[in-house]
């Protein structure tokens, strides 16, 4: 089995990576950062997002394992003190995995050119200065004209990030859906939006047509400047992200440990 290691620049992460590489090689596992079967991230959730985008073209054939170098992250199942247990799980790997939905974003330029991007967490359209004005289409029909700071579209696992801060719901990843939330929308007697998050199932599309060219499009940790973009289309991707399920933590337990203190009985 071929294993890649993707770590952040923190000194602690680099030291743990060195120890991990030595242990993997000692146990007969191959390090291959080009065409791996397993990608181990050493860092936090941001490191895992970076690894996802780095290996996005191989997403069908790889599984991720998150090793956190601080407190346990949302996507990470292992602590730096558990290297021996992790290596043991890798040596006894039988292909077990758990899969989550992804966001497919299509950027359509005025020239007609289209570019596809995949996001693990979310995408957002924001106006750095002034008000973002955009027409929102659902079911192929004009639904509303949005005015505000921006719009975010999240996957179920990404629903605990920017989406949650926007007042969106936390979706379980067994729901094959995406969620659109408003960022500081303008609602008064003249301008109205629905004012609530929208959950769209697989097979349907959210189309956003901004009325200006001065906006930013962000997906996970990447950014696109909105120049000569005619529309953006969002849907549940056909592909999924896969994690090695050696001792996979239940989704609601992840939410609990990320946001809720222990409850005294």
UniProtKB/Swiss-Prot annotation:
UniProt GO molecular function: ATP binding; metal ion binding; NAD binding; NAD+ kinase activity
Xref: PANTHER family: NAD KINASE
Catalytic activity: NAD(+) + ATP = ADP + NADP(+) + H(+)
Entry's EC annotation: 2.7.1.23
GO cellular component, one term: cytoplasm
Active site: 45 (proton acceptor)
Cofactor requirements of the protein: a divalent metal cation
Keyword field: ATP-binding, Cytoplasm, Kinase, NAD, NADP, Nucleotide-binding, Transferase
Name listed for the protein in its UniProt record: NAD kinase
The organism of origin for this protein: Leuconostoc citreum (strain KM20)
Chief location of this protein within or outside the cell: cytoplasm
């Amino acid at each position: 089995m071929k294993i890649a290691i993707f770590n952040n620049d923190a000194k602690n992460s680099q030291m743990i990576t060195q120890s991990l590489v030595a242990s993997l090689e000692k146990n007969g596992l191959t390090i291959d950062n080009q065409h791996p079967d397993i990608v181990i991230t050493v860092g936090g959730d941001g490191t895992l997002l970076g690894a996802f985008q780095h290996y996005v073209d191989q997403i069908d054939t790889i599984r991720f394992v998150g090793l956190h170098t601080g407190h346990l992250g949302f996507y990470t199942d292992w602590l730096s003190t558990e290297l021996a247990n992790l290596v043991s799980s890798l040596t006894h790997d039988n292909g077990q995995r758990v899969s989550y939905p992804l966001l497919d974003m299509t950027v359509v330029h005025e020239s007609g050119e289209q570019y596809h991007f995949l996001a693990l967490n979310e995408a957002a359209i924001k106006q750095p200065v002034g008000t973002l004005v955009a027409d929102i289409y659902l079911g192929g029909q004009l639904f509303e004209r949005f005015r505000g700071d921006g719009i975010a579209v999240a996957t179920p696992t990404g629903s605990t990030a920017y989406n949650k801060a926007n007042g969106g719901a936390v979706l379980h990843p067994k729901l094959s859906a995406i969620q659109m939330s408003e960022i500081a929308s303008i609602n008064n007697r003249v301008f109205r939006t629905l004012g609530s998050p929208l959950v769209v199932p697989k097979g349907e599309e959210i189309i956003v047509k901004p009325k200006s060219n001065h906006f930013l499009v962000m997906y996970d940790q990447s950014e696109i400047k909105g120049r000569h973009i005619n529309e953006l289309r969002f849907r549940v991707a056909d592909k999924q992200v896969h994690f090695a399920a050696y001792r996979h933590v239940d989704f609601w337990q992840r939410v609990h440990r990320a946001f809720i203190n222990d409850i005294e009985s």
